[in-house]
UniProtKB/Swiss-Prot annotation:
Role according to the record: Catalyzes the reversible phosphorylation of UMP to UDP.
Name assigned to this protein: Uridylate kinase
Phylogenetic classification of the source organism: Bacteria, Pseudomonadati, Pseudomonadota, Gammaproteobacteria, Thiotrichales
Signal peptide: none
Subunit structure: Homohexamer.
């Protein structure tokens, strides 16, 4: 892929403002737990590259590298609502780490949380988002929606709507959307592009239904891509080699 800035600038306008959904595990090393700054550095570098191109970028990060909330095996000892609240706190930890890693690379970044923490996290306020993004500041959304029983996918779709994103980029470890599980079926077919209607009719796995429906209703395309590929985030904006676009038509 060319690094020529003039070539990049010709491709970027259709994705001037994006919402990137990251899993918590993307910040950890191979063990999948905790935060490993070396493992996360390629993500930081690519975010910096995109901001240098003039892309306005907001992030939603999960907390699965610390605690998977409702998926945690607590039996009947901890209520699901409490577990989800613990998961929201995990996303706050990841968001603070991302903010500082970005700032260390000269990228202006700020964390907004569904639940504020005095002296630490600002409460998410939709009317501020446009001003902050227009300044070139990367926004990192933490704390989910502030409610239990809601996935990080839904948080991502909600924030994408609030910021008026041109697209929601969902970073995964699979290079797009398949007609069946590629980890189980060697003949699984990958789609370069698929419509929202086809996802429903073919029962394809893109993201949770609430998030998917919200993106469809607000005409926000979804790009599912493999973050583990070299320079995959920058490619998602420029060339889209490592994933699948979900569009209205």
């Amino acid at each position: 892929m060319s690094n020529d800035s003039s070539e990049c600038s010709q491709k970027l306008p259709k994705l001037k403002r994006i919402l990137l959904k990251l899993s918590g595990e993307s910040l950890s090393a191979d063990q999948g737990f905790g935060i490993n700054v070396e493992s996360a550095q390629p993500i930081i570098n690519q975010i910096k590259t995109l901001t240098n191109f003039g892309v306005e970028l907001a992030l939603v990060v999960g907390g699965g590298n610390i605690l998977r909330g409702g998926r945690a095996n607590f039996g009947n000892k901890i209520r699901r609502a409490t577990a989800d609240s613990m998961g929201m706190i995990a996303t706050m930890i990841n968001a603070l780490a991302l903010r500082d890693m970005l700032i260390s690379e000269g990228v202006d970044a700020e964390v907004f949380s569904a639940k504020g923490v005095d002296g630490l996290l600002k409460v998410a306020s939709a009317h501020e988002f446009n001003q902050e993004l227009a300044k070139g500041r990367v926004l990192i959304f933490a704390g989910g929606t502030g409610n239990p029983f809601v996935t990080t996918d839904t948080t991502a779709s909600l924030r994408a709507v609030e910021i008026g994103a041109d697209a929601l980029l969902k970073a995964t470890t699979v290079n797009g959307v398949y007609d069946k599980d590629p980890n189980k079926y060697s003949d699984a077919k990958r789609f370069d592009k698929v419509t929202f209607s086809e996802v429903v009719s073919k029962e394809l796995n893109v993201m949770d239904l609430g998030a998917f429906t919200q993106c469809r209703d607000f005409s926000i395309p979804i790009y599912v891509f493999d973050l583990t590929q070299p320079n995959a985030l920058v490619d998602a904006v420029l060339d889209s080699k490592y994933g699948t676009w979900v569009t209205l038509d």
